[in-house]
């Protein structure tokens, strides 16, 4: 896969700079999401930090509800698997008891993230119900 920028170039940009490149037309939100997904694929086997990548959000950021005119236009963003919900997406809160739980609606905060232009591309691990400091539950992840 050909990426739109080198990893050295990627790391020299913060989120607002990456979003500015999308707004200017220098990059597309899809290219940015593909680069983020490639980075996740590269480091996640060692970290086990991302439990789900939303391929549909990577392939079609606008279809995922990201505002193309927001201050964070097209910026890939990972949601903690706890707290704000995304309609139709799993939210299992790091718990076997919640396995298969799908959100019925976006929360207010999720709506604000989307309005700001963030492209919600996946979920990250969380300790069970956020109660402790470690998300190393092999039965869940």
Task: Locate the predicted segments by residue.
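Gly/Ser-rich catalytic/binding loops embedded in alpha/beta enzyme cores
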Residues: 2-141
């Amino acid at each position: 896969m050909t990426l739109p920028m080198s990893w050295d170039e990627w790391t020299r940009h913060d989120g607002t700079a990456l979003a500015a490149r999308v707004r200017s037309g220098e990059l597309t939100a899809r290219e940015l999401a593909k680069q983020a997904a490639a980075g996740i694929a590269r480091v996640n086997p060692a970290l086990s930090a991302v439990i789900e990548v939303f391929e549909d959000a990577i392939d079609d950021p606008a279809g995922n509800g990201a505002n193309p005119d927001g201050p964070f236009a097209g910026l890939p963003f990972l949601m903690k698997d706890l707290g704000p919900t995304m309609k139709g997406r799993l939210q299992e809160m790091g718990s076997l008891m919640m396995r298969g739980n799908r959100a019925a609606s976006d929360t207010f905060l999720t709506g604000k993230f989307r309005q700001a232009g963030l492209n919600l591309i996946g979920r990250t691990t969380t300790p069970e119900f956020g109660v402790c400091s470690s998300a190393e539950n092999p039965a869940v992840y």
